[in-house]
Structures are given as C-alpha cells and as structure tokens.
Amino acid sequence: LFEEDFLKKFLLLLGAVVIVFGLLAAPFYIFAKMADGEVARRSLGEGDHNSLKHGLAAAELYATLRPVLGSDYAADLTIVIGEMVEVIEQHTKHETDVAREVYKDLHNNLYGVVAARWMEGAGGSNDRQSRLRLVGWLAETDALADWAEDKRVPESLPWTPDIDAALAAADTDRPRLEAEFRAHLDAHRHDIAADLALAAK
C-alpha cells in the first residue's frame, strides 16, 4: 500500500513537472508563426526564420518571467530552458542537430534575452510587437547567426552531434557575448529606433 501511494505521488509530481516545463518551453515552439510574419515583412531568407524564432521565443519567455523572478533570474532561467529544449530535441528530432547547430540556436536565444533586457532600459516601448520588430531588425542586419557555418560559431565545435560540447561552449562564451550584444545594441540605438518607428506606421 505504501509503495502504491508513493508511486501515485511520484507520478503526480512528475506530471506536474512535465506540465510546468511544457508551459515554460512552449515559447520555443509557438512563436514560429509570428516569426513567419516578420520574415515575410522584411523579405528575409530561410535561415533568418529559425534565428528569428529562437531570438523571439527567448525574448518573450524572459519578458513573461521578468515580473515574477526579476531580471537576472528570468534571464538565467530562460537560458537554462533553452538549453533543456536543445537536449530534449537531441532525442526527439528525426535528424539530430550537430554541435555547431545547437550552439547557433543558443547564441540566438541569448541575443533575444539581451535584446529584451536592453529594451527595458532603452526608454522606449517594451511590448511584444516592439520586441518582435527588434529581433527582426537583428535578423535583417545579420546580428543573429543563421547557419551552423556562421563564423561566430566556434571552429572547435564538431560537425557531429555533441550536446555537451555545445552547451559548454555556450556557457563559456555567455559573458563575452552578452557584453558584445549590449554594445552592438547601444551603438545602433538610433537605427533601431528608426526601424521600430517605421514598422509601427
């Protein structure tokens, strides 16, 4: 009886964890349609769709968690969830992503988070449409990494599946990339403001 009761509680807890993770990970799948619209509006290519989708999903998940967890914790949790999604996809996708592809996705996730945080301090609008337009601008100006061949993906990463190597490289590079992303956004503040204003018309 004790074992049966324990098993029920364990299964309920496991189910709750799966549901919570599913809700948190959902942005990495449900924003594809919004990305489609922005890709079409800007006449972007195939690679831009994936990079824009990752950047937007991370930005939106961060923006959702931010009021509850605060900026730093929301950013960290968004990055961790993005990494967990990549780990799960290693076991569920028909074609397993190579390490360079995984790093590329994590690079774009991080840029989405940094962009959303940057908008909070930029003094402008910080709604979903503005975040979409900002990530779209990043895709259009090649700030996001489109392909595994991108020069911003470390040459040391293999062209074979190696999730551990990709995660380790992304974690190591995160402080440097965050600083570079913020500097890029600051340097192009006026271009971004003009692009968002034009898109809003």
Q: What residues fall within each predicted segment?
A:
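Divalent metal-coordination and catalytic microenvironments
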Residues: 105
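Functionally important transmembrane alpha-helices
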Residues: 110-115
